[in-house]
Amino acid sequence: MIKNDQELNVTLDRVRQFQLQVANLRHVERNPANYRLSASGYLAELDRMTLEIREYLWSHPTETPSEAVA
């Protein structure tokens, strides 16, 4: 769970790195099945981080993310 803006920025950087890694895999992996196997872990982690970012951004700075759940 992202707790502050510094953690948000770190997570945003990680998202960008993972996106670049998957984009690179698309160009270097010639076998579609191998590509999917290689990319699936990155994509799952991207989904998890994106959800964390969304939950953090949904909360107002005066409340904790768990208070903002609607």
Label each residue range with its predicted role.
Residues 11, 15-26, 49, 53-56:
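Non-transmembrane amphipathic alpha-helical segments
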Residues 60-70:
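Long amphipathic alpha-helical coiled-coil segments
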Residues 1, 27-38:
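Short, Lys/Glu-rich amphipathic helical modules
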Residues 1-13:
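Short, charge/polar-rich alpha-helical segments
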